[in-house]
Amino acid sequence: MAVEIVKSSMVTAGEATPEHRIWLSNLDLLVARSHTPTVYVYRRTGPDSDAAFFSPDVLKAALSKVLVPFYPLAGRLAQDSAGRPEISCTGEGVLFVTARSGATIDDLGDLAPSDELRRMLVPAADVAAASILAMFQVTFFRCGGVCLGAAIHHTAADGLAALDFVNTWAAIARDVAGDGEAAAAAVQRPWLDRTLLRARSPPAVRFDHAEYSRRRGGGSKLPFDSAILPMSKNQLNALKGAGAGAGKRLSTFTAVVAHVWRCACKARGLAVAGTEAATRLYMTADARTRLHPPLPRGYLGNAIFRASAVSKVSDIVAAGPLGAVAEKVSAATARLDDGYVRSLLDHLEQTAAAASGGAAGLRKGEWVMPESDLWVISWQGLPLYDADFGWGRPAFMGRACLQFSGLVYLVPGRDDGDGRLDVVVAMDPESLAKFKDVFYEELKC
């Protein structure tokens, strides 16, 4: 499918903004040091003659307004004198691209993440522009539909912070008058001070943070495919009920994660490696409400961190209800309180002190997750579909591409009453084909 770039420009804040540098926490330094690519798909809701549908002028005017409170995103990724990454609030602006395609929205299929989807619909930074923190592309399709591709640097914002920005931008765009009450009320003032996640002095590490230990990976990255596996409300309810066995009903998260973990072990054939073979499940957690006091609403930065559960493969694939597997998932997340998060921040500070180059050397690195392991990220509870720019809410929102085999996203459908949850999976092609079969077969049990 061909996409033609029509125009590229930089959009800056509509008012003067402070020029200073923002310190980044260790959680900021340990996310992927790249842009997170997402796509929002909108179907035309008005008449074909509506020339104002997704007007670039309206979008850019609103973007200029939202960059006033969110001015760090108009800056650039830089380094301090010691080489530690930081955000330089230069006000240089964000990239805004308009494009068009002779294809239709339906030609995109089910919008499963892929490198092609990212290449077509999300702007990419070349080496010279790698420090740009936010980039957007609006692609107009022959059918009248539109795709907004967003690329926000992960060092600058995690998923919730990025959604706060896009949703506030959309709310301002809905106020076509430009400066009325709706726009003023829409602005969620971001919290810019990241020192709330600074380590204690002296550090006090009270937990084992194995998720941040350097483990031997599986060598080079394997080729992988991605797929979206939808789960209906009825399937979710059946899984939660059957998985509990004689105990209490499982939560959606623990039931689905346990189900995915078991199916992945079976699809990958891990059980044949021997009963003592181990598998580790990584999960991404949010520190915002786990801290006491909680982080301020609108925290602009990364508050996400890793948690994990480890088990023998034989225990995961054992016949019977999912309850035992779900218990492992629940146990791994139950302990993630204020004390745990503070211990993690201190652990990372100690790791940085011991690293070559200090904090400047603290980064996620090129570690490759072993094929025995799984990494699940849940987008449940996030405001994924609130980006209404004045022409309706998105019909679809999701990742444009995934990074590695074994990565799984749990993405809720729009709150239209159907209660659907999409399981988005990246896995080597052979295992993925088996995973699809096992995934739905297990739901019938």
Swiss-Prot record:
Manganese is among the record's keywords: no
Keyword Phosphoprotein: no
EC class name: transferase
Record-linked InterPro entries: CAT-like_dom_sf (IPR023213), Plant_Fungal_Acyltransferase (IPR050317)
Enzyme Commission number(s) of this protein: 2.3.1.-
Family annotation (Pfam families): Transferase (PF02458)
Active-site feature positions: H154 (proton acceptor), D388 (proton acceptor)
Tissue specificity note: Expressed in leaves.
Keywords associated with the record: Acyltransferase, Transferase
GO molecular function: acyltransferase activity, transferring groups other than amino-acyl groups; hydroxycinnamoyltransferase activity
Function: Hydroxycinnamoyl transferase that catalyzes the transfer of an acyl from p-coumaryol-CoA to putrescine, to produce coumaroyl putrescine.
Similarity comment: Belongs to the plant acyltransferase family.
Record's protein name: Putrescine hydroxycinnamoyltransferase 1
Taxonomic lineage: Eukaryota, Viridiplantae, Streptophyta, Embryophyta, Tracheophyta
